[in-house]
Amino acid sequence: MALQCVLGAGRTGKTDYIYQQMIKESMENRDENFFFLVPDQSTLNAQRELITRHPNHGTMNIDVVGFYRLSYRVFEELSYIPKELLNDEGKSMVIRKVMGECRKDLLVFGSGMEKQGFIDEMKSFFAETYQYDVSLEKLKEAVKSFENTDSLTLKMKDIVLVLEKFEDYMKDRYLVSEQLLDVLAQKITESEKLKGATIYIDGFTGFTPIQNKVLKKLLPYAKKIVAAFTIDEKRAGGPYRDYELFAMPKKEISQLKEMAVRQGVPIQIGRAHV
């Protein structure tokens, strides 16, 4: 187990380094599993680039995946069948249904649910709570800390009520796509393919909390994780401020380092040498 952060400004060879090292190591260790983790929308381009660069013009023992595709790889390996995924239209229908059922208990949103775009806004909020690993219990605790009765507090109480009804309805029936990564995090240590695998990561500016939850589980379980970040090595150290230019990569490097240290995973940080 090891963590390597590859740093460098834009167009300084980080991606070239990732491809070169990944191909080299995969050819030297043909019996080992390699994963190339990229944003979900970039998997096709990454596969094409890998095939072009590989001497054998094939991905061989390298699996190009996004976080969601990685979920399905693990589920398939374990013969695990997750609950049926609810699409966007289905989410809207369920939200509208549960809001209708608890409409009389809503403090603010009861009269607004028929407005154009309202259900979509609620759906987006729910998606973000799952992506950022904000549970219903955390929201309830936050609302309890509000002591006033202003508009924001009343809206938050409505949101908590609707989310609770939404999750009650979904339980034992469906999953939303944003919940898949939480299931993946729970299943990682059951996967033989991920055990001792080498994972290369490129194309991300940062990770959501639920993605970090997956990476935290992978760090001690994989043989090595190599992640590229667009930031000069000199800028990567020290504290960061949310509004500074390179806040996202600095924050992510800091979080990965903290997760690695807490789990006794060795860390190497430096620029790419192509």
Positions of PLM-derived features:
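Structural recognition of the conserved hydrophobic beta-strand(s) that form the central parallel beta-sheet
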Residues: 36-38, 64, 200, 224-229
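Conserved P-loop NTPase "ATPase switch" module shared by AAA+ and STAND
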Residues: 195-207
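Walker A/P-loop NTP-binding motif
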Residues: 17-28
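Conserved RecA-like helicase ATPase core segment
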Residues: 211-271
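Conserved RecA-like ASCE P-loop NTPase motor core of nucleic-acid helicases/translocases
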Residues: 18, 31-43, 227
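Basic/charged alpha-beta structural segments of nucleotide/phosphate-handling enzymes
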Residues: 18, 42-43, 51-193, 260-270
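Walker A/P-loop
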Residues: 2-18
